[in-house]
UniProtKB/Swiss-Prot annotation:
It comes from Mycobacterium tuberculosis (strain ATCC 25618 / H37Rv). It is a multi-pass membrane protein. One of its GO terms (cellular component) is plasma membrane. SMART domains: AAA. It is found in: Cell membrane. One of its GO terms (molecular function) is ATP hydrolysis activity. This is ESX-4 secretion system protein EccC4.
Amino acid sequence: MNSGPACATADILVAPPPELRRSEPSSLLIRLLPVVMSVATVGVMVTVFLPGSPATRHPTFLAFPMMMLVSLVVTAVTGRGRRHVSGIHNDRVDYLGYLSVLRTSVTQTAAAQHVSLNWTHPDPATLWTLIGGPRMWERRPGAADFCRIRVGVGSAPLATRLVVGQLPPAQRADPVTRAALRCFLAAHATIADAPIAIPLRVGGPIAIDGDPTKVRGLLRAMICQLAVWHSPEELLIAGVVSDRNRAHWDWLKWLPHNQHPNACDALGPAPMVYSTLAEMQNALAATVLAHVVAIVDTAERGNGAITGVITIEVGARRDGAPPVVRCAGEVTALACPDQLEPQDALVCARRLAAHRVGHSGRTFIRGSGWAELVGIGDVAAFDPSTLWRNVNQHDRLRVPIGVTPDGTAVQLDIKEAAEQGMGPHGLCVGATGSGKSELLRTIALGMMARNSPEVLNLLLVDFKGGATFLDLAGAPHVAAVITNLAEEAPLVARMQDALAGEMSRRQQLLRMAGHLVSVTAYQRARQTGAQLPCLPILFIVVDEFSELLSQHPEFVDVFLAIGRVGRSLGMHLLLASQRLDEGRLRGLETHLSYRMCLKTWSASESRNVLGTQDAYQLPNTPGAGLLQTGTGELIRFQTAFVSGPLRRASPSAVHPVAPPSVRPFTTHAAAPVTAGPVGGTAEVPTPTVLHAVLDRLVGHGPAAHQVWLPPLDEPPMLGALLRDAEPAQAELAVPIGIVDRPFEQSRVPLTIDLSGAAGNVAVVGAPQTGKSTALRTLIMALAATHDAGRVQFYCLDFGGGALAQVDELPHVGAVAGRAQPQLASRMLAELESAVRFREAFFRDHGIDSVARYRQLRAKSAAESFADIFLVIDGWASLRQEFAALEESIVALAAQGLSFGVHVALSAARWAEIRPSLRDQIGSRIELRLADPADSELDRRQAQRVPVDRPGRGLSRDGMHMVIALPDLDGVALRRRSGDPVAPPIPLLPARVDYDSVVARAGDELGAHILLGLEERRGQPVAVDFGRHPHLLVLGDNECGKTAALRTLCREIVRTHTAARAQLLIVDFRHTLLDVIESEHMSGYVSSPAALGAKLSSLVDLLQARMPAPDVSQAQLRARSWWSGPDIYVVVDDYDLVAVSSGNPLMVLLEYLPHARDLGLHLVVARRSGGAARALFEPVLASLRDLGCRALLMSGRPDEGALFGSSRPMPLPPGRGILVTGAGDEQLVQVAWSPPP
């Protein structure tokens, strides 16, 4: 409610009257003075009566001592009493003066209380003057004055209670001052002729006894108060009257409170005047109302309380007696009850009849709708173009926002003061429920209805993400509707950039137009015929700006910049909030030239906005507000309502219109409404004024310049991105996403150019941020813009298997997962081979760069090869599981770009990529990082990349971007590509038959011992025992070690006669039984004892072959000083032969260094488990020191490097790595020779 004139309520402490003074004892000096004077008098008398003194001669001299004696006695007797009486008198004078001053203060308080009470409860005869004003319907449920009604005037306690301090005891009290205090309290503890109010509460019936005429006069006064102070949405007034008394209450029919909320008759809402209480109860049974007041003027009396109804009865008849109020057993006599004549009550009711309550609780006068205020009239026939053409310069940017209490339209003009406006910037503050959102919608809709999009654009911002502006997004005037900034902090920085970019854009347009000083001059230049683009005023409305500045204080700098230059740039601000904290504006208040304030939470908030507390005193009615212009003038207004239903006449063609008829308007219910003809169409919902006007605006005027483009919430589709992209300027430049540039108010394709130094790519982001998708998008984009003869891909998928989805592309040669280590290794080998081949090709053909080669390739297809991309998804996993490949990849990244070989990888952190590789990566795509502080692009911007938005990240220049989704069809690309396909990676078969390998090898290998097929070229591979006499085979169980020995044995037999080769097979597990059945068998040993005997004979043979001193150099060169077969000692399961008790093969140790000259060959197979330790055993250590060849078959990698840098790895049976020298390794599949 409106608080009205202030009235003090604090208690007044009245000082108690003084006590009577006690007689005070004299001081010692005063008590001794009479004694001294007496002695002095006696001395004088003695002197006088001495013989020869003058007194003896003249008796007149005796008068002097006698006078001294008398004066002394009188002074001693009377001096003390005189002082006591004088003190009491002074106390009385002081206290009576105090009461006189206090009387003046109390009188002023009483006068202020009179004013306040009469403002709160005015004379009922004056109520009609308040109708239509700000105080009408001000009392709301829950307020202290709700249903508190004046019933008359009389004595009332003083608002400031007079509290007397502790009184002195009765025997010590001063009777004069005590009597004065008693009279003061009796005169001022109450005030006379004060309005007396009683609360009306649901409970037992209230009865008013007395003279019926006076009782009805009091009831009329009470009902008019209820109707003026309370809204019909919150309180209804019913009447239960007999037919004899109905004429006294006929005026009730005019009250909007007396109209039934649901029931209707032929005249509209049914009046709530009934004949009996039961009839009223039945009529109100279906209504859900907080309060109903029923006037009962019948012979019937209520037997108790009626649920939800306050009943006031005309009680017992007492002719000539004043009314007496009876309620709940209490009786209140009224000395001077209020009276309201019937004609005065009728005037009050009929004035209230013109008022209703809108859907938001806002009061309005019939006929004062928004359309009428704006000048539209019938919204259905509204032609925006016509209205815009008729708007003159004065009405430009000027819009009605509501009406004053007397119905005058209130205009908001956001033009600057130089153009007789209120702007350019303003403030709007209103508490929750005050109608602030409706006011903002009203302003926005009015601005659009009265101004063309060429004149005005709107940027609507709602920090909290409410629905204030959502319906306005489709209007041609709206540059953007920005919501939900509170939950999306990065969008606040984006809006800051967008507003700064708009200021920069407008400044640039003014410069290009001839360094114009303002938008006003720019528009005048356009009107005079200058060919300039449209530059409308931008009206920026920011709701909940206080919350925005609270969470993002730096945003005030943007508002300050607009406040300083917005006038010249045509950017107008309207800042709205529920509350305005002192100091929050930080200098912005100097730029706010007009202010609108609705109901505020406190008086201090109202003072912060307007400089007065008037906004706090506004009624709780939504939409009630004050407008303060730059001159300080305050204009009270009620906001127009645009969210209500559109009022429009029914089409005359639907049903014939009945002729008008005259019906009596009484308190009796008219005939019920009869249903019209049943049509064949369903009821069409009534649109709101807002939506109806927005529908009429569609298609009129140019669309507003998009200051705010939609955020990167949804990733684009790659297909659409490629269709819209401009032709690439470089050979390998493709768009893979969208970059958001809010300052430039644009979104541009994220184009990655891989044709030069930026040919290597790294995609870095936290888990589930879209790294794999980004690599797929890159592959798809290149595949869609290049055929398989120009770009090819080989993928290592160590992520979640996403790259397997591109395997169907013709551009993809192979996709290897973590379960395919051989394919991964083979892929690297092929790419390394490609680099070496291209290096030689460039050198032979005088090509100085890969760019030059691409130019030549475009002219001639001869000797063309594609750009090859090694795509690695999951760099950390590759380093962990296939560490041997890392160095090859780093070398490939360093050397490959010069020959058209690229590396693209994904990682979770930049730290996972070693500097040696990171330095080779020129194209860096950074998605959301787990720790934004790890960003290598922009740490501050990295913090703003949203979480749980796969594909969102930063471009190389620190701008926000989103990767496109790869929506292309690989099968369709394969059909479109035609014949060119990426060559697959040749892989070794799981099994190679020995006979087929022998047939394939033919006679090319000569006497070399055939082992199987090598991976690189798929050709047979052999072991040259002539150059390297020994071979070590290592592997786990079931890996094919014995099969490899079986193949070697049979191959030795096949390629050598028995005279040239003999085999000594050491087979403690009997796995090589019957492998050799020819004369090549020197011996088969299956036990340590037998082995010792055989080796003894062998040692004798070897000792005999040692060159004698007389052997010539020619004999040594031709190895002709001895004759006989080479001896092949084939040892299976060497770990069973070399045991802790001894190693029989130790006898051969001294001959191993001379084995090639002596015709000795040692072929040893051993488990790889514990091989790292076993290689220090003397025989094996000697073999390794002599550089023997090794075949590393399947084993555990944790054994470490066994030969050079080679370490075991899981391999299929029969497959192994043949180590033929330092760093020379090749993967082979051992030819399968079945056991006998």
